Amino acid sequence: YPEEWDVDWKENTHYSLGLFLVQYLGNGFNLADAAHLTYNDHYFQSGKKSFQFIRQKTEDRSDNEVVIPIIPPLQTILDQIAAPPIKGSLVFPGIYGDAMTPIDRRKRVAMENQNIKKRVRRLVKSMGWEVQPSCTWCRHSFATNLTHAGVPHNYISESMGHSVDSNITNRYIDAF
């Protein structure tokens, strides 16, 4: 991080960058999913090697479970910014903060999305990049990169929590 940034800004940017990368490495899940992610039975039964959850956006319409393998880069980020693994606890409690109601939690997720966007954009600008990334990029990049790598469409759809007979995944491919 640039030397001229104060310590608090560097720490906040590091946390935001971690959440940004977690969204990509987490099968392109969104920040609401990250906020709600818990250290559940699956996490411990997998030997702390994967997360399992139902997407927040579709939980009322679908019970499709998403499984996220914890690959080494994701584990590195978890070691730096996630809460310690305690059964039933949130992985990223800082997203919700002290918000208790669903409305307050949605507001906190929206605020954290804005924080991530602001901090990551300032970081890439300091590196001389001309792009303006957002959290949406994570989902689109996940789908696009897997497609370019030749991963079957059904696998990508399942990984993203979409039904395999749906065309929703196509909306995320090559858009970014």
Tell where the protein language model's regions lie, with residue ranges.
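Short, contiguous acidic/charged loop-to-helix segments that flank catalytic cores in large enzymes
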Residues: 6-10, 56-69, 103-112, 129-137, ...
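Active-site/catalytic core of tyrosine-dependent DNA strand-transfer enzymes
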Residues: 1, 71-130
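Short, basic (Lys/Arg/His-rich) helix/loop patches that form interaction surfaces
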Residues: 4-11, 87, 117-158, 162
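Conserved tyrosine-mediated DNA breakage-rejoining catalytic core shared by Y-recombinases
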Residues: 36-80
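Short, well-ordered loop/turn and helix-capping segments at boundaries between secondary-structure elements
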Residues: 28, 40, 80-84, 148, ...
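Catalytic-site neighborhood detector that most strongly recognizes the C-terminal catalytic loop/helix
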Residues: 55-59, 160-176
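Extended, hydrophobic alpha-helical segments in both membrane/secreted and soluble proteins
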Residues: 30-34, 143, 168
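Basic, Lys/Arg- and aromatic-enriched nucleic-acid-binding interface segment
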Residues: 1-31, 35
